[in-house]
Amino acid sequence: MCYKEEVQKKNGDKLQRRFEEDSVPKFIQTYFINIKSKKGAINYYIAIKDLLLWLMDKKIIDKTSLKDITPEDFYEVESEDVTLYLDNKEQSGMSPTTLETRKNIFSSFWKYLKRTKKCPVKENIIADVSYKGISSNNNIIKKFPSETQLKNMEEKIMKKKDEFIRVRNLIILRVLKGTGLRESELAGLDMSDLYLNEDIPYIKTIRKGKFREREAVPVYLTGDATSAIKEWLEYRSGLKNIIDMDAVFFNKNGKRLNENNIQDIFTTYGYGVTPHMIRHWYATVMANTGNLAFTQQQLGHSSVNTTVNNYTNGIYGMKDVLANM
């Protein structure tokens, strides 16, 4: 079993444990089957569970436990109830961007309730929810790092005395800047995923493909990312204590890096920069070249509209300019 499959299985098991601990009814569990990313399914469950607990607390669903909820209970929930939930959450400090995401999750869940024969729900009430959150696109300037932040991060890594840590972390930063990979995709990279001698060098990573099935897809490399990986492979060839031989990146003990390890690198050296901010930085640079179809392919978006809505923004490149005016 490869790393990516292990992570999926681990998250799938974690989700199932939550179902068992909360005694979640089967008709609710069924909704999560079609969410291919089990990590995503966990986040969906957290949001849906929170809404259901709130509905029970307000006696809109007249039950005291998740296990007692029946399909008929959803017939009592109205769009105004969900609007009030979202308003209350915002007043409690939850960000409008997060709440907009939750609203989308609830819409997906109610579409399932409407579709399944096990539930009497006849319409997707979320369509009439009046709460207006903030699109993640409106928060774009907070999503990508400034050139100053990136330079400071690189300089801080360069000061690390431990050669292995210094070399590896610099390479990781360059690869992320040149691919837009997610942490999980970088952690899951195997030696067999590297195609560095092709006319256009690329790596393969597992993403959602057609019909939401997970499949290996190419991500093409910038010149610097290609050079960085080649430099790492040369350095890697001189290391003696590699345990996970398939892994491209690993820790000092020779074991594959995981997502938390990569996040820790950015916590230590990043000056507030996160791996996902690097992904936004890469995506915005790519989108501003004008080739949106290629950018969509590189990021693994299902629709070019997602790319347009999130990454074609005139503010890119202006953060440092404005700060120095």
Identify the meaning behind each predicted range.
Residues 10, 24-39, 48-140, 159:
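N-terminal core-binding DNA-recognition domain of tyrosine recombinases/integrases
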Residues 75, 135-153, 211-223, 240-245:
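DNA breakage-rejoining catalytic core of tyrosine-based enzymes
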Residues 167, 255, 271-289, 302, ...:
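Short basic/aromatic active-site micro-motif
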